């Protein structure tokens, strides 16, 4: 029986920043948040912080978001390793073109023992989960049978290991066509702060697919821990159905 995979979002990289020694400026933040402030001040050479209302890093970053000077957010980035996400969800995720992606390859990695992600609309309903599991098991059995027969057909009597590797890849790329959209995949996603804000604004909405909304909320919680001055304006709150959304009163992009 197919095992289910829970969503997991792991922070694996973030921006570091070093102030140039010849610039007479310091701030009360570090990493990406400091870099964003530095980039903004570099536009105007305002190293002396002439405006007391934007003297702190948090107040400066809030101001640039309020006025829509979002290009400076592009200098800092965060990378996540995301597991327990379905193929159907990553098909939506990769539509965000300002992210960079490296995803598990079904051509190189056999899916005989792959896990599945239960759609939120099915989750918790015993009857629906039974139907879902049966369908997932049937597709995986068909995959295994197709893979075995394709490998036997394509390998033939070719002795060379290089050709054998190619034939196995060709067998997997054909057999994977019967795997369900619910098949778990794993993906590294890197994006700058501006791209992450856009993703959260679009996908943490009530109108987004629930699986990718859960992903957006999970990413947001990690992002707030990394750069609160950039992401803490998003408020997470529950809906009547128990699911969560996130909204912000500040500038976002459609």
Curated annotation (Swiss-Prot):
Disulfide bonds: none annotated. The active site is at 203 (involved in ionization of n3 of dump, leading to its activation). InterPro entries: Thymidylate_synthase_ThyX, Thymidylate_synthase_ThyX_sf. Its EC number is 2.1.1.148. GO terms for molecular function: flavin adenine dinucleotide binding; NADPH binding; thymidylate synthase (FAD) activity; thymidylate synthase activity. It comes from the Bacteria. It catalyses: dUMP + (6R)-5,10-methylene-5,6,7,8-tetrahydrofolate + NADPH + H(+) = dTMP + (6S)-5,6,7,8-tetrahydrofolate + NADP(+). It holds the Pfam family Thy1. FAD binds at residues 71, 95-97, 103, 192-194, 198. Pathway: Pyrimidine metabolism; dTTP biosynthesis. It is an enzyme of class 2 (transferase). Its cofactor is FAD. One of its GO terms (biological process) is dTTP biosynthetic process. The keyword Transmembrane helix does not apply. Keywords: FAD, Flavoprotein, Methyltransferase, NADP, Nucleotide biosynthesis, Transferase. Signal peptide: none annotated. Binds 4 FAD per tetramer. Each FAD binding site is formed by three monomers. The keyword NADP applies. A motif (ThyX motif) lies at residues 95-105. Belongs to the thymidylate synthase ThyX family. This is Flavin-dependent thymidylate synthase. The gene is thyX.
